Every structure is written in C-alpha cells, then in structure tokens.
Amino acid sequence: MNPDVIVIGAGFAGLSAASALAERSVRVLVLEARPTLGGRATAFTDPATGERVDNGQHVMFGCYHETFQFLRRIGTDSHVLVQRQLTVDTIDRAGRRSRLKCPVLPSPLHLLAGVLTWDALGWRDRLAALRIGRAIMEVPRRLKPALYTSATSTRWGGAGASGRASSSAGAAERTHRNGRLDGLRRAGTVERTRRAEQQLETVTVREWLKAHGQTPRLIELLWEPLAVAALNQPIDIAAATTFVAVLAQVFGRDPRSASLALPLKPLDELYALPARRYLEQRGGAVETGAVARIDVSADAPNVMVGGRPLRARAVICAVPWYALAEVFPDRPAALSAVLDAAAQTAASPIVTVNLWFDRVVTDQMFIGLPGRTMQWVFDKRTVFGEQASHLSLVSSGAASVVGRSNQELIDLAVHEVRDALPVARSAVMTRGVVVREKRATFSVAPGQPPRPSIETPVPGLFLAGDWIDTGLPATIEGAVVSGHRAATAVMDVVR
C-alpha cells in the first residue's frame, strides 16, 4: 500500500491516532517493533495455565472520555465496566474492612458526602476532608486555559435618530472598556496560574496535602492510593502539579468522572486486536516486528524498515520516551532538544504479582490495601466473569521492590493477601507469576525536563505518547489524548 500517514508504535497512543485517521478515510500504516501489539499495555499467554495475563493491571476512571471515544470507535466500549458511583472497599493494615461509597451528587459534593459517611474515618479526618473540599472545587477553574481576549467588536445597525445612535455609541464604548478590563483580568489570571503552577512544581503531593490540613489517616486511606495509582510514584517524591491536574480531571462536573472503570477483557482483546481489525477494514495495514528508523536529513521524515524505504505525507512517532533515540539514530539537530529531554526523563516502575489459588478467596472485583506494599488486589476471574481463583496484586511506584527476586515478590504478595483475606490462609497457592514494568511510566518528580508538544520542528513529523505534554500523568487517557491530538494535527497536512 501507499500510505498517507505512517504511525510508529502500536500502543494506546499510536492505535488511537491511527484509528482516528482511518475514521476520516486516511490510509494508515502502523509499524510496531515488537512481535505483538499493545506496547506497555498488552497481554501474554501464561504457559502453565493457558490464560491471557495482562502485563499489568490497568484501571481507568469515568473521566477517560477520549479513551471511551476510542473504544467506541473500534467497537469495544462495552468491554469496560464503569461504576455507577465511586465505590471502593478497603482493608487497612489492622484488618479493618470499610467501604467508601459516594452518592450520586454533583462533583465534588459526592466525594465529600462519601467521605463524611465513611466509617473508616474519625471526625477529625472528616473535617479535614471538608477543608480540602473548597480547594478541589477551585482546581478545575484554576486549571482552565486563561485566554487573552481583545475588546469585543460591536455590530452597528442603522440608527434612525441621533439619540439612538448616541446610545449605541455609548454602549459600544462601555463594551470596549469592559472588554479591555476583562482582558486585563484574564491576563492577571494567566500570570497567577503560572505562578501557582511553578510553586506546585517544587512541592510534593504529601506537602501539598499537609498544607491543606489533611490528616495522616485520610492521606493513607484516600489521597495516597489515588495519587500513587494515578501518578505511579510515592507521594513523598511526586510533584503536586500533576496530582492537582488529576483532581481537576477526576472531580469534574460529572460525578461519574471519579468512578472506577475496569476492563472486562485482556488488554489485547480490549483494544489492540480490535484496533488492528478496524484499520485493516478501512484500507490500512499493521506490521509487527518492524523496527523503524526515521531520517530527517532532507527536512522531511523518511522512514526506513530493515533497509526498505517508506514514504508518506506525514509520520506520527508514538514510541515511549526511552525508545525515541533508537528511532532517530542520526540525532537530527532539529530534534536535539526533544531527544535531550527524553534522555533525561526518569522512569518509575510497576510490579504486578499474579497468584492462582485452589479455591475462591474473595467475591469482590477489587480491594484497596492501604499502607501495604501491594496497594490493590484484583480478582481477575470475577472481572472476566469466570470462577475466581486468579488474583492480580499491584505495587505502583515500586522502585523499592522492583529489584527483588520473583520468589521474594511472590512471598510478599501471598503474605499480604493472607493478612488481608482470612479465607486465603487456608487456600493453596498453586502458581505465581511476576510482571515487572521497570519503565512503566515517566517520573513526575520535581526537576524533570519539560514534556514535548505534538508538533516538531520537522515538517510532517508529529509525536504522540503518554509522555507528551497533555497536562495528564502517564495514563491510558493521556496516551489517547495525545494520539487524538496528533491525528488532528496530521489532518491539516493530508487534507
């Protein structure tokens, strides 16, 4: 085929970009270096059980609007279960069970109401939640783009009398003056927002929470699990900037924005394989095992795969930050700033331990384990509608444990499961599989280099990926947002 656009990388970013272009009748060729699609969000077959196992447990939120748009496009949105209201069961380190259940109220009142009735908290903790409630309500407004505006133009009509004309002129002058004042106010808002963001970049999530009067108990049970799950970094390390952006997204106007959404299929069945079918049905093509290199010596992106030249009107490079240098081995001067930033970007790992038991140990889809190394446990077969015995335990921001041996991690996971779930103490663990993603996400610690934009200095070359500057952390939604934005930018080239 002679593609209009080449997409390099077949994760959420690359496939969402490719499918969005195919939807607009653009011929797309997707190149993936690995033998399978999905990038860092994929699945493999466990040789002992024959089951498809995700390379990490991925949880979404109800506010992942562009992700759901992508899944609707490829016909798999029904394979995600979205809670009607945010409900989270937890078992703390003392073995106490509790449930956070948020009623259907306008956001963030639903969260405050849920916290106020959460039996795991004391009144001091609940009062602390009220104190931060106002800050949460202000977050979305603060983070909206503050645009500079010019004076409002006035459409003049034919005034039949001088009095009416004078009145119209006075109204126009007032409109002009108010427009200038509004522009100054918005400019001031922009400057205040910039200053606030700069301050947040130097403050950790824990420091920000303490500054808003949050108690240790509330931090451990609510804010730390949310922050670590979203940012994949301990709250003593992660900068508050991205966490505040997460609050703006999760606690938007729709109370279901904060609801958890669980895939009901392995990740390759959820999006990778359906996206491939979608592309091929629309005249596109997907190649795996295709190691692509880009040469921009002629001020345009020229793609090579194993010595085979490929030409297209535009190229989207949707590889992770740590793989960018491999795609541009000649290190073009026009991309030196982006390549330097990518090379200096640190990574944060995730460890997932899959355990199989000889009997049912829980009837719940997922349970939070605050204060433990394994922060969440998911019953995979309950999620997939089968008999339960396969648990997936997740440790996000796992720099402190990623270097342990497989057996040490399995022993740790078994200990924490049995500590939290008494039924598991009499169950026999029949198999354990450890999945390490050492570079699961980019770091959001203070001092990281700036994230690049979709556009590059090279005409016809665009970037996509969860590490692109979307304002979101390294999430599925961040990847899809970048893919859709890249597709929109490409349409200006291929129209």
Where in the sequence are the language-model features?
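N-terminal Rossmann-like FAD-binding beta1-loop-alpha1 element of flavoenzymes
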Residues: P3-V30
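Glycine-rich FAD pyrophosphate-binding loop
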Residues: A22-P47
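Conserved FAD-binding subdomain of flavin-dependent enzymes
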Residues: A48-V82
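Short beta-strand to alpha-helix junction loop
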Residues: V59-C63, A196-E201, H212, D254-Y278, ...
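Mobile amphipathic helical/loop "lid" adjacent to a hydrophobic cofactor/ligand pocket
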Residues: F68, R72-R73, S78-A240, V244
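Mid-domain catalytic core of redox enzymes
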Residues: L86, A290-L421, R451
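Conserved flavin/dinucleotide-binding core of flavoenzymes
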Residues: K101-P103, T362-D363, I367-R495
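Helical element adjacent to the flavin cofactor pocket in flavoenzyme catalytic cores
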Residues: V246-N302, L310-A314, A318
